[in-house]
Amino acid sequence: MPGMISKNPDLEFDSLQPCFYPDEDDFYLCGPDSAPPGEDIWKKFELLPTPPLSPSRAGLQEPPPGGGSIAVGRGGPGECRPVDPLDWASELLLLPPEAELWGSTDGADFFETGLGASNNLNSIIIQDCMWSAFSAREKLERAVSEKLQSKPPAAAPPPPPPVVPTAACRRREQPQRGPGRAELGGSVPECVDPAVVFPFPVNKREAAVPSGGETPRGGRRPGPAGESRASSSSGDDTLSDSDDEDEEEEDDEEEIDVVTVEKRRSSSNKAVTTLTITVRPKNTTFPSVRTQQNELILKRCAPIHQQHNYAAPSPYMESEDVPPQKKLKAEVPRPVKPMIQPKSKSSSPRNSDSEDSERRRNHNILERQRRNDLRSSFLTLRDHVPELVKNEKAAKVVILKKATEYVHSLQAEEQKLLLEKEKLQARQQQLLKKIEYKRTC
């Protein structure tokens, strides 16, 4: 299988092309160094389920004392392996699934770190950062804790290489520790430093944190080896934790302003309740003062939520806490005139409202009485008209017309009666004169 790797980086994936062509002739023509397939052809189709893993720091360790170049591979001591990490990736793709990447049974891992069977932990811990998740992180932490408890820690670990502070940059320079390391650092500008991606060291002997190293950006102090391994599963997690710590520090710095703003709001009788939680184990006196201020804010703002009546007494009269100075200034006794004027102003609208309501009520009563009188008058008029006496459903217009006609007829009869009266009176006078003449004769 190692012989199928193409030495030309442009043709490094040509070894995989026969897997996708049905031609058997092309299947065996993989390259000049190609070997015939094994008995089980299907093993060639069993590719790794993950993208190519980043090159480990095992290939970047100190060169041998002889000063020669680093030989990377799984063969014997005299066999030469490609130094380019691109060849490492292609060789990783062509490994059989039963082969161990980071540790082998014969005491040497894939990159010949020479750590023996104790380095099998790395095959569990170091995974690709694209496939990391919370469940995988918990499993890794559990496996790390079990293996750390079962195996004693190594003594006198050398310091690991310094970590590049920015994780967003893809181009990282490999740390150069020897003459053979310069070629690796210059030939692979796009290779990610495993120290940034994996917080777990490839070598167990490099687990401890150096005492004189730089402190992280988040301000955390380095803990023991177990805690450093179980802290996170990728460099992104560490950077996000440091960003969260920076945000928490900014929030802690802004909390004093929040407390002052809440005091101003409480002085203006606004119902505001805040609960600020601070976790700062370094400072001992500052959190205690902060919690006392928060308790005061909660005690002052809680009764304001229950105060619905503006005429009710101030809640500070019943509470044992001393109100702030602004509240004392606001509660200074005012002169009598300003207090009476609002009452008179408030009473005048009330009086005007009451007068308007009484006026409306009286108007409604009078209007109702007028309508009743009008109806009764129409009924009486209808009763006086001889044509409408028995007509209860007569309209008002009909009643008025018939009534006018009846009045005109009555007036004509009156005139006739007056003329008849005058005639009768004149005859009476003639008769009286005749009676007096006969008496005299």
UniProtKB/Swiss-Prot annotation:
CDD domains recorded: bHLHzip_N-Myc_like
Bias (Low complexity) ranges: 222-237, 342-351
Region span, Disordered: 49-79, 144-189, 206-275, 310-369
Comp. bias intervals (Pro residues): 154-164
Gene Ontology cellular component terms for the protein in this record: nucleus
Residue ranges occupied by any bHLH domain in the UniProt entry: 358-410
Start-end of Acidic residues biased regions: 238-257
Residue stretches in coiled coil: none
Gly residues: compositionally biased ranges: 67-78
Pfam families documented for this protein: HLH, Myc_N
Domain of life, per lineage: Eukaryota
MF annotations from Gene Ontology: DNA-binding transcription factor activity, RNA polymerase II-specific; protein dimerization activity; RNA polymerase II cis-regulatory region sequence-specific DNA binding
InterPro entries: bHLH_dom (IPR011598), HLH_DNA-bd_sf (IPR036638), Myc_transcription_factors (IPR050433), Tscrpt_reg_Myc (IPR002418), Tscrpt_reg_Myc_N (IPR012682)
Subcellular location(s) of the protein: Nucleus
Any one GO biological process: regulation of transcription by RNA polymerase II
Phosphoserine modification, residue list: 240, 242
Alphabetically ordered keywords of this record: DNA-binding, Nucleus, Phosphoprotein, Proto-oncogene
Subunit (UniProt): Efficient DNA binding requires dimerization with another bHLH protein. Binds DNA as a heterodimer with MAX.
Protein name per the record: N-myc proto-oncogene protein
Lineage of the species this protein comes from: Eukaryota, Metazoa, Chordata, Craniata, Vertebrata
